[in-house]
Design a protein with these regions (language model features):
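Short, charged/polar surface micro-motifs in flexible loops or helix N-caps
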Residues: 8, 32-33, 287-290, 376-379
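Acidic, metal-coordinating catalytic segment for phosphate/diphosphate chemistry
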Residues: 300-332, 337-344, 349-351, 355-457, ...
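Short Gly/Ser/Thr- and Asp/Glu-enriched loop/turn motifs at secondary-structure junctions
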Residues: 95-99, 138-141, 275-279, 364-368
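Non-catalytic surface loops within mature trypsin-like serine protease
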Residues: 106, 139, 286, 300, ...
């Protein structure tokens, strides 16, 4: 069974503010570069959708109600709904703050059938929270997710055994999980427009020249075959944070402070889960939407801010040194219109890294920065030798004290001088304290769910439909159960 909480953030805003009921509600970053996190179905009638620039949404729906995300509240309601689902089954695989798979094999015998079971769960959620959800029941995860999306909002669709291919046959190939615009274009060029066209093939061999190693998965899903189990205990492979800036960054010191901020947030998230990361990567987007990334594997897995920060600076400077005269050729460009580029001379800024690493100015305005830590595990790293620097031990003790203080007095109660400068100094990104808290909340909201990258500046919360289609960051079941609806 797949459960999706319809227009979750917007629905909570309408629930908490009855005067919003029946009106278009748009939740997201409210700056000129903000992005829609989600919107009510009333807003969708105007063409507004998740991941749309807020400026575009305001043109389409000028009379809409625009709301800044309240992540504490959304997570509170999400926890309540997940608790309700646990009343029906202990086998739950969270996909995000508002979406999950439930293993309900055999449970339909306790009701008059699968549809009655789905109705019971939906009614229970509405009774306890006042919110509607959509549910899909099917023999496997792919079909269950597809079913939950067929009759939104407040949908309840059952795909019984034996009718998998019949239901899928008339649907476009873009409904296959993992088929994006590029793969869709390739398949269509090969004559495959609907799932029935793929179903007509005896096996995946005809697809291999088109999509390579994706062929078997695409053929199986088009035929309703999906053996993935519900994973009740999943390993998070990566965490990340990125921010789109209302004003482009052009100063090396400001960029340094941003990496310090990201490293601080990610290290805390790792320590809360007792995880260590093996790989650090940075993402850079210029004002013309040229985007490039670099990564480095650590000698020893870490959960420390200074390690992530220093590695980010090393990657940044390496990127700058590689491309001192022009933007990266290998970078992909978004389809958004290009902006003017202002070239500036490289200069060095002394950064606050304990290793004295210098931070270089960018070759042009920076629209977005991101930092990701991946290759996560629960292994506690050992010192390589007795002669290692005592810095890590000192940092561990300091981090433990700061974590304890923040758990008692809040995320923004204790702040290093560098982070204070980030929010209040001349080179930093000024924000009100309430905005800082919202940014922190947005970044940590899904720590108990799927691994996500959260844009703590403009997007605030990743689009849930996008998260559901990017499960590369989640790997390996720890506990699995066989499905037999």
């Amino acid at each position: 069974m797949h459960v999706d909480m319809d227009a979750f953030f917007a629905s909570i805003e309408q629930l908490d503010h009855p005067e919003y009921k029946g009106h278009p509600v748009i939740v997201g970053g409210l700056s000129s570069r903000g992005v829609v996190a989600t919107c009510s179905y009333e807003a969708r009638k105007f063409g507004v959708h998740s991941a749309m620039p807020i400026s575009r949404a305001k043109k389409l729906c000028p009379d809409g109600i625009y709301v800044y995300p309240r992540m504490d509240r959304y997570k509170e309601v999400s926890n309540q709904i997940f608790s309700i689902m646990k009343e029906f089954t202990p086998y739950i695989e969270p996909l995000s703050i508002d979406e999950a798979f439930l293993e309900v094999s055999g449970m339909s015998t306790m009701y008059s059938g699968p549809k009655a079971l789905g109705r019971a769960i939906k009614d229970r959620v509405f009774e306890k929270t006042g919110l509607i959800i959509s549910a899909g029941l099917a023999p496997n995860k792919f079909l269950a997710k597809l079913a939950s999306d067929l009759d939104k909002p407040d949908g309840l669709v059952v795909i019984p055994y034996g009718r998998e291919k019949e239901v899928l046959a008339p649907l476009p190939i873009k409904r296959i999980w993992g088929v994006g615009p590029r793969t869709e274009k390739i398949l269509k060029a090969g004559g495959f427009h609907l799932m029935r066209h793929i179903q007509s093939l005896p096996d995946e061999s005809s697809l291999i020249p088109l999509v390579g190693n994706q062929a078997k998965r695409i053929w199986e899903l088009a035929n309703g075959i999906d053996d993935r189990p519900v994973e009740t205990d999943r390993k998070i492979q990566s965490i990340g944070a990125e921010e789109t800036y209302e004003e482009d960054l052009t100063d090396g010191r400001a960029i340094e402070l941003e990496f310090r901020y990201f490293a601080n947030r990610l290290s805390k998230r790792l320590r809360r889960r007792s995880l260590h990361g093996h790989t650090v990567s940075i993402k850079v987007r210029y004002d013309d939407f040229t985007t490039v990334s670099r990564q480095k594997r650590l000698d020893t897995p870490s959960d420390q801010e200074h390690v992530f920060f220093e590695t980010a600076l090393i990657l940044w400077n390496k990127l700058m040194q590689d491309k001192t005269s022009k933007r990266p050729k290998e970078s992909k460009k978004d389809t958004e219109p290009l902006g003017a580029t202002t070239k500036v001379k490289f200069t060095n800024f002394k950064c606050s890294s304990s290793k004295g690493i210098t931070c270089m100015d960018p070759p042009g305005p920076i629209r977005l920065l991101g930092l990701t830590v991946s290759g996560l595990d629960e292994e506690v790293p050992m010192q390589d030798s007795l002669f290692d620097s005592p810095q890590d031990e000192t940092e561990d003790k300091l981090a433990s004290v700061l974590d304890s203080l923040e758990s008692k007095f809040g995320e923004t109660a204790v702040m290093s001088g560098a982070l204070w400068q980030r929010f209040h100094g001349d080179n930093g990104i000024r924000r009100k304290r309430s905005e800082l808290k919202a940014a922190v909340d947005a970044q940590t909201a899904q720590d108990d769910g799927a691994s996500t990258k959260v844009d703590v500046g403009s997007t605030k919360e990743a689009n849930q439909s996008i998260i559901a289609d990017t499960h590369a960051s989640i790997e390996g079941p720890k506990k699995t159960v066989k499905k037999d609806l």
